[in-house]
Amino acid sequence: MLNIDIIIIIIIDILVVLILTGFVSLCERRILALVQIRIGPALCFFGILTPITDGIKLFIKFIIFVISFDIIYLIGAMIITACCIFLGWFYFPIGFILLLDTGFTLTVMLCVHVFCSMFSTFFVGCFLFSSCFVYLSAMRTMFFSIISESGIFLLYTTIYSLDYFSFFGIKDVCVGQIYITNFYIAGVLFISVFWVSMLLDGLKLPFDYMECESELVAGLITELSGFFFVLYSVLEINHILLTTLLFASLCFGGLFICFKAILILIFGFFYPRVIGYRLKITTAQAFILIFLFYMCVLMFIWLFTTKIIAMLF
């Protein structure tokens, strides 16, 4: 009976994640269309059937492309992608459903984030396509992903060093911020650095390196068609959703986490894509990102040192 309950919970989690991914994708496209005054073709019945026709065209392209592709590699990539998409949600409470309520939740989230970011770049640039230019652009993008993941790791460790009882548990950190004395994380500097690190980690504007490299070498996203495009889109949107919920829980914890996450998703991730501009990968850009990494290091050392002094004296 217990196994049936676990299977039902897993199915509910997967359905909720897929529905959230679909709604977030439609919301993002709608905001971009409204800002650019480009509503769309509105094909038949006020545009209701337009997403269906677009999906049919994508999968027709996939049927043509998959003829020369090894099916074993495709199945392996799909399994790894599914693990990246759904594993992190089992540690995050959706309503009253919490499958894995253990310590070290932030550590698991960090591992999922690192693997998801690295695999998405590898999946696109190093695995599906044999072009040397796409391979080099994927390596450049992966370099900046490593910098962002290192900064996020230090910020997670800073959160742990500021709390005495969380034990890397996201639920304890979130609930502990209900009390005004524990509302220590919502500093302007910490939120700013954490937000920029999350934008860099999700490869969103102004750090949209995947699109920049696509324009340079014509290949990181533009070669995706059909099923590969759907896989990468679901992986990217799910990564942004987990990032938003983590940002809302760690920096604005307490009550109404879902409402705060929706506001952060719109104003923190959608609108920068609307009003921002892309920063190309240059030497100056690399120095800026390394400076961001050292800012995270200094913040971690400062807060960790003050906690050690407080514990000793």
UniProtKB/Swiss-Prot annotation:
Statement: the UniProt record of this protein carries the keyword Mitochondrion: yes
Location of the protein in the cell: Mitochondrion inner membrane
GO MF entry, a single one: NADH dehydrogenase (ubiquinone) activity
Chief place where the protein resides: mitochondrion
One term under GO cellular component: mitochondrial inner membrane
Family per similarity comment: Belongs to the complex I subunit 1 family.
Protein name, as recorded: NADH-ubiquinone oxidoreductase chain 1
Organism: Leishmania tarentolae
